[in-house]
């Protein structure tokens, strides 16, 4: 089953220095029916104004994945670690109890646009504190997984995350690990098909809950970029 969640249905925020779209309850936006999906707690698209920053804060034990769509960001923690990430890169932070983290748009004249996901982290697992990956913009790519398969970022949870790039008319099929997945459109229009021949059309910024499907096929109606988050638990 595919249930779409359009960009217009998501929570919105505009603070001047920050513009945001929230898939699930976050900050001032609250919907008791949308507190996350399986181990996916947060899925935001945010635009930080030139020079803007998120002040240091602590997090619950989650893995934070930032997919940089445009601009350049710097991340720092209270332990003295820092890293920069630019458009075309994904950065994974394995947050730790008692450690605070900040984010800063390094540009003085260009906004920073990125997708941010929070995934519940298994408390028994200890992964590298910071991991970074270059995105392959020419094809589909596994960018995060439990064991770091195929050079992907290593998560502390049973989640597989795919970055998908297709040209118009191309298609890609994905075998899912369990009964749940979430599909997020980044750019342009495409449709998703299940083996039950159920079909859902998505445009820029739309998402879709996928339930009880063994596989899903994406067909690009125009050049497409999307994320598929495979969430068996």
What are these regions (language model features)?
Residues 95-125, 211-233:
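Ligand-binding loop in jelly-roll beta-barrel domains
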Residues 4-14, 21-31, 39-59, 69-76, ...:
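Conserved short histidine dyad/triad with adjacent acidic residue
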Residues 79-94, 135-138, 194-216:
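Short acidic-glycine-tyrosine-enriched beta hairpin
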Residues 63-119:
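Contiguous mid-protein beta-loop-alpha structural module that forms a pocket-lining wall or clamp
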Residues 45, 64, 90-92, 114-116, ...:
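Conserved hydrophobic/aromatic beta-strand scaffold that supports enzyme active sites
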Residues 110-194, 200-204:
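Conserved, well-structured core segments that form or line functional sites
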